[in-house]
Amino acid sequence: MASTGSQASDIDEIFGFFSDGAPPTKKPRKLLPSLKTKKPRELVLVIGTGISAAVAPQVPALKSWKGLIQALLDAAIDFDLLEDEESKKFQKCLHEDKNLVHVAHDLIQKLSPRTSNVRSTFFKDCLYEVFDDLESKMEDSGKQLLQSVLHLMENGALVLTTNFDNLLELYAADQGKQLESLDLTDEKKVLEWAQEKRKLSVLHIHGVYTNPSGIVLHPAGYQNVLRNTEVMREIQKLYENKSFLFLGCGWTVDDTTFQALFLEAVKHKSDLEHFMLVRRGDVDEFKKLRENMLDKGIKVISYGNDYADLPEYFKRLTCEISTRGRSGMVREGQLNGSSAAHSEIRGCST
């Protein structure tokens, strides 16, 4: 006997398919209560290489330290700035995974004048070559991530990054928003950022490629900030009083710059509550990371099994946090199920 339309629909639902044959929507990860109840102004977003790699995956220099150094080396070779023996030496160090900070430092020294009194440097040319035309290399899913970050910034969240690129600033400019790039060479502005007087500024703790003189690879490069007790006190107060949300960071807390700024002088570590969004991936690695980070006051949260799950997860989280920041407590279900609730927040429409 022929099935009615209603019966066919029931059968499709039982077998997990819609009438057009498409698989059902994957059930989204639930949002952690202790994170989703935060307000934007209670957060400091920490942007790592994973975000830049997701925004512009075709740019190898954005994916890792090693990728960046290789790209700088390739640029130096293309510009005929290194002798054959020198380029072979650098390639060998990269291939053998020697200390990448030292390799990068040596390469920068090779491309820079022997005296700090001279502004002219080939390093700047290589940086601009590596990060050339980033705007055209952004992918839509990556832009969704930047949109969420920008929205939280506009609602009071602070943003710092370990990345040298200015993808967030470029995206904001495309949206008609002006963000300022800060680095650790400007103590006055860093202090104002930490005091929440420059909320639409992005603090690049390693520097940003548009200001090569501000790029630092190890603590010796920013002694001016470390010696400034007022700046350091304000920076460390952020880590003690706000919740840091690590995005695309992996092992950022092991970064020497991050440790010197936020971890080494922080007292009362038992009071900390920070968060790290990561892909679940390998179960053993995930478990190890979660245990290690929890000892540091950081809750590791899985946004899904695939990198592609992050934009949608972070968008839902942004909508929830931003709505709470505006109107107090709301139920997650209201946001997940109500297009009206989403549409109140720019960039959160379904």
Curated annotation (Swiss-Prot):
Q: Where in the cell is it found?
A: Nucleus, Cajal body
Q: What InterPro entries does the entry give? A: FAM118 (IPR038916)
User: What keywords are assigned to this protein?
Assistant: Acetylation, Nucleus, Phosphoprotein
- Residues annotated with N-acetylalanine modification: A2
**Which family would the database say this protein is a member of?**
Belongs to the FAM118 family.
Answer whether the UniProt record assigns the keyword Acetylation to this protein: yes
Phosphoserine modifications at: S9
Recorded GO CC terms = Cajal body
Annotated function: May play a role in Cajal bodies formation.
UniProt keyword Phosphoprotein, yes or no: yes
- Tell me what this protein is called: Protein FAM118B
Q: Which Pfam families match?
A: SIR2_2 (PF13289)
What organism is the protein native to? Macaca fascicularis (Crab-eating macaque)
